[in-house]
């Protein structure tokens, strides 16, 4: 089947946030809610997890492989010499406290660390433990969530004022017509964030030009959030905690569409210390499972990332792209020559490959597609790119 001509891909929606695939998600919360323990079990690292505020001062950064049964299946089929999954970049940020936007605690330094991230794991504590102090004196995850939201909101309000003042000076009083649209857009942002007291991400009708301006300033409330609720081991196993319903109701009302994922840092730490066989027995005996795979996948998706596969006996690899990436740009992730000389993308859907059992069987079933440069790559596509070089045509 020849590659489809122009128009074989819809225009992808604009995305608020930094452009690229090396994006980071930061673990944010009050001190002593379990952030460093979570970071340790997530990344198998040993960041300090002491029982006092601000034990994490410089953010710890690591990357974790994204678990995917599709990747595992392709590796089983091809038995490749090299296996490279997709990765999620995770940053452990020190605990925020009330008044951080005014410099309380380690204040502005922490907020700048959040600014350097592209998404947020908002971790809150819903377990009681007399040995672990709470910076606010009691366990109340709703209050804690609201403190974090307020600090991010107030920091954005603090940032917006000087931006508008500068634009007004140049675009309005100075008559710079090129900057007038940006000034108008920032006034709209001010109305939403400051006057209506709403985060940037809650407004779903930003147009392309507005998103372009938002991406220039990268406000904290524009960053997507995944809410992680740290439970005791007992509560996690029995799937019961007095705060869970209240947290879900708060998020549904205040951050509609955001995910709430319960987990237990204590359980995950215990599982990590067991052998693989002991871990499996423990999980089966307690009829439970680790929440980490779900959390990693949720963080990856929150950053608007996905991946396609290249697969063969030499290598099975997941190539990370932003949602909405077209075939030539996806090819460029492998090598710039692939994008410059792009001819077509030969695409198999993962489910078709799994159902049919081989590439030849997919072709025989008429499910092997040749796509042109307007094709928008879909998550899990298995792709072979054809491209031209000055010397010859090649295929990978």
UniProtKB/Swiss-Prot annotation:
Top-rank taxon: Eukaryota
GO molecular function, one term: ATP hydrolysis activity
Keywords, sorted A to Z: Acetylation, ATP-binding, Cytoplasm, Hydrolase, Magnesium, Metal-binding, Nucleotide-binding, Nucleus
Cystine crosslinks: none
A Pfam family that the UniProt record links to this protein: MMR_HSR1
Needed co-factor(s): Mg(2+)
Cross-referenced CDD domains: TGS_YchF_OLA1, YchF
Positions carrying N6-acetyllysine: 294
Record family assignment: Belongs to the TRAFAC class OBG-HflX-like GTPase superfamily. OBG GTPase family. YchF/OLA1 subfamily.
Job description of the protein: Hydrolyzes ATP, and can also hydrolyze GTP with lower efficiency. Has lower affinity for GTP.
Name of this protein: Obg-like ATPase 1
């Amino acid at each position: 089947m020849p590659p489809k001509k122009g128009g074989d891909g819809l225009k992808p929606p604009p995305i608020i946030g930094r452009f690229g695939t090396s994006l980071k998600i930061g673990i944010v919360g009050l001190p002593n809610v379990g952030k460093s323990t979570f970071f340790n079990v997530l990344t198998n690292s040993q960041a300090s997890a002491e029982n006092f505020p601000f034990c994490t001062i410089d953010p710890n950064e690591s990357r974790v492989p994204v678990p995917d049964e599709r990747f595992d299946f392709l590796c089983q089929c091809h038995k490749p010499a090299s296996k490279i999954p997709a990765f999620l970049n995770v940053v452990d940020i020190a605990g925020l406290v009330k008044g951080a936007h005014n410099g309380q605690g380690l204040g502005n330094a922490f907020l700048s660390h959040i600014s350097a991230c592209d998404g947020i794991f908002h971790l809150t504590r819903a377990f009681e433990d007399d040995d672990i102090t709470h910076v606010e004196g009691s366990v109340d995850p709703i209050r804690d969530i609201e403190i974090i939201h307020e600090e991010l909101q107030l920091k954005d309000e603090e940032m917006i004022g000087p931006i508008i003042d500068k634009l007004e000076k140049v675009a309005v009083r100075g008559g710079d017509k090129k900057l007038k649209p940006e000034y108008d857009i920032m006034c709209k942002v001010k109305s939403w964030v400051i006057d209506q007291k709403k985060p940037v991400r809650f407004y779903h009708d930003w147009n392309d030009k507005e998103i372009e301006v938002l991406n220039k300033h990268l406000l904290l409330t524009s960053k997507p959030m995944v809410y992680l609720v740290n439970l005791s081991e007992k509560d996690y196993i029995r799937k019961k905690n007095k705060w869970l319903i209240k947290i879900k109701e708060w998020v549904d009302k205040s951050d509609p569409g955001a995910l709430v994922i319960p987990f237990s840092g204590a359980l995950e730490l215990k599982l990590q210390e067991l052998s693989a066989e002991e871990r499996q027995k423990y999980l089966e005996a307690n009829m439970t499972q680790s929440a980490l795979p779900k959390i990693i996948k949720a963080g990856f998706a929150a950053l608007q990332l996905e991946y396609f596969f290249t697969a063969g006996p030499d290598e099975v690899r997941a190539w990370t792209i932003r949602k909405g990436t077209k075939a030539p740009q996806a090819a460029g992730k492998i090598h710039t020559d692939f994008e410059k000389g792009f001819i077509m993308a030969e695409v198999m859907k993962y489910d078709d490959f799994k159902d049919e059992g081989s590439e030849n069987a997919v072709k025989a079933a008429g499910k092997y597609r040749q796509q042109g440069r307007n094709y928008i790559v879909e998550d899990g596509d298995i792709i072979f790119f054809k491209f031209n070089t000055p010397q010859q045509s090649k295929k990978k």
